[in-house]
Amino acid sequence: MTLPNVEWAVSPGLTPYQPALAFMEARAAAIAAGEANELVWLLEHPPLYTAGTSAKAGDLLSPDRFPVYETGRGGEYTYHGPGQRVAYVMLDLTRRGRDVRKFIQSLENWLIGAAAQFGIKAGIRDGRVGVWVDRSGGREDKIAAIGVRLRRWVSFHGIAFNVDPDLSHFGGITPCGISDPRFGVTSLADLGHTVDMADFDTALHLAWTEAFGPVRRADAPELVPD
C-alpha cells in the first residue's frame, strides 16, 4: 500500500515562534522543489502576538505585553499561546488544482468538523475570516483563526484553534481587526468543554482525513534555536 505524502507531526511543549517560522519557510521551499513531503505540523507557542499583512498599528493595544512578530501571512493581529492548538499547513496546491478558494474552504470545513466532534455547531461568516459560534444576546465569538500564505503555490502558516487558552490575553490586541463588541473570542473550555490537547488532536486528525484525505505520522521537526 502506498503511504500518503502528507505527514502529520506534533511537537510537545511550547515551540518558540522564530525557529518555527524559519522551519516553515524552509520546508515550504523544499516542498516546492520536490525535495520534501507535505506536512501538517501541530504545536503550541508561548504567549505572543503576530501581525499579518493587513495589521493596523492601532490594533496593537498593549505592545509591551508579549513579544510581537511580523509575519507574511494574511490577516491582522492574532494571539498565540498555551492552550491554543496551532497547526501549520504546508501543502502543494499545484497538486490540488491551484484552487485557493477550495483550499480555504477545506481548512474551514476541517475546523468546523473538529468542533462538531464536541457537540459545537461552528461555521463561517460573510466578511469575517475564521470559524465562529453563536452566543446569547446576538453575540458571535471566534473559536478558530485562519491565516495562510502561498509561495510557489505551497501553503504555510495555517490555523489556530482555541482549546483552553487564557482568553484575557486577546485583550492586548483587536483580534483580526474586529472592534465590534458583538464579536469576541471563545474556546472549548469557555463553551463548557474540558478537553485535553491529545483528545483534541484526535478530533483534529479525524476531521482532517474527512476534509483533505489521509496522512501519515511523522517525527516532530528539529528546530534550530534562536
Curated annotation (Swiss-Prot):
Residues involved in substrate binding: R73, G74, G75, E76, Y77, T78, Y79, H80, A145, I146, G147, G158, I159, A160
Annotated site (Lowers pKa of active site Cys): K142
Major localization listed first in the record, in broad terms: cytoplasm
Domain of life according to the entry: Bacteria
Recorded metabolic or biological pathway in which this protein acts: Protein modification; protein lipoylation via endogenous pathway; protein N(6)-(lipoyl)lysine from octanoyl-[acyl-carrier-protein]: step 1/2
Keyword Cell inner membrane: no
Enzyme class at the top of the EC tree: transferase
Keywords carried by this UniProt record: Acyltransferase, Cytoplasm, Transferase
Localization of this protein: Cytoplasm
Family annotation (CDD domains): LipB (cd16444)
GO biological process, one term: protein modification process
Active-site residues, as the UniProt record annotates them: C176 (acyl-thioester intermediate)
Limits of the BPL/LPL catalytic domain: 34-216
Residues making up the signal peptide according to the UniProt record: none
EC numbers: 2.3.1.181
GO CC terms in record: cytoplasm
Substrates-to-products reaction catalysed: octanoyl-[ACP] + L-lysyl-[protein] = N(6)-octanoyl-L-lysyl-[protein] + holo-[ACP] + H(+)
Any one Gene Ontology molecular-function term assigned to this protein's record: lipoyl(octanoyl) transferase activity
Entry function: Catalyzes the transfer of endogenously produced octanoic acid from octanoyl-acyl-carrier-protein onto the lipoyl domains of lipoate-dependent enzymes. Lipoyl-ACP can also act as a substrate although octanoyl-ACP is likely to be the physiological substrate.
Family: Belongs to the LipB family.
Other facts noted in the record for this chain: In the reaction, the free carboxyl group of octanoic acid is attached via an amide linkage to the epsilon-amino group of a specific lysine residue of lipoyl domains of lipoate-dependent enzymes.
Protein name: Octanoyltransferase
Gene source species: Maricaulis maris (strain MCS10)
